[in-house]
């Protein structure tokens, strides 16, 4: 629902593409209103915090990293918990270290792949599933992050 809402706003030319802080704030607001469950709130936190960092003069990688830190703070997920954090954090670490978008995409893919080997999930919807169900399957949120970064390359 969130991606469709943003895509619809983009197609209707309702997004302030030339003003990244405003864009991120608007995306955060829209995600909070259309995405269900905790995912919408957490993605809203990420984009809103990133927008604030951009407004204060931060670079895009720094802003996204700040958004991730806020999301982790409020959501509680960390690397190794089998969530989108396992793919997003390594990708953003690569970008903040000055690596290329392709290298960030590789980091996201490796992070997503690592979730398929995790014995249990400590956060997110996957935490309700048993080991047999999780074995060999990437976390859906981590996989989504992997696909987003792959599409950007």
What kind of region is each of these model predictions?
Residues 1-153:
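N-terminal loops that bind phosphate or other acidic moieties
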């Amino acid at each position: 629902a969130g991606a469709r809402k943003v895509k619809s706003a983009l197609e209707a030319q309702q997004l302030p593409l030339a003003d990244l802080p405003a864009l991120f704030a608007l995306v955060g607001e829209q995600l909070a209103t259309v995405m269900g469950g905790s995912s919408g709130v957490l993605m809203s936190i990420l984009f809103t915090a990133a927008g604030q960092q951009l407004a204060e003069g931060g670079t895009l990688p720094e802003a996204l990293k700040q958004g991730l830190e806020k999301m982790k703070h409020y959501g509680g997920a960390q690397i190794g918990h089998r969530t989108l954090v396992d793919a997003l954090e390594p990708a953003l670490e690569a970008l903040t270290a000055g690596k290329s978008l392709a290298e960030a995409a590789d980091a996201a893919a490796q992070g997503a792949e690592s979730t398929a080997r995790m014995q249990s999930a400590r956060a997110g919807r996957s935490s309700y599933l048993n080991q047999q169900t999780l074995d060999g399957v990437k976390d859906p949120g981590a996989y989504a992050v992997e696909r987003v970064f792959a599409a950007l390359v």
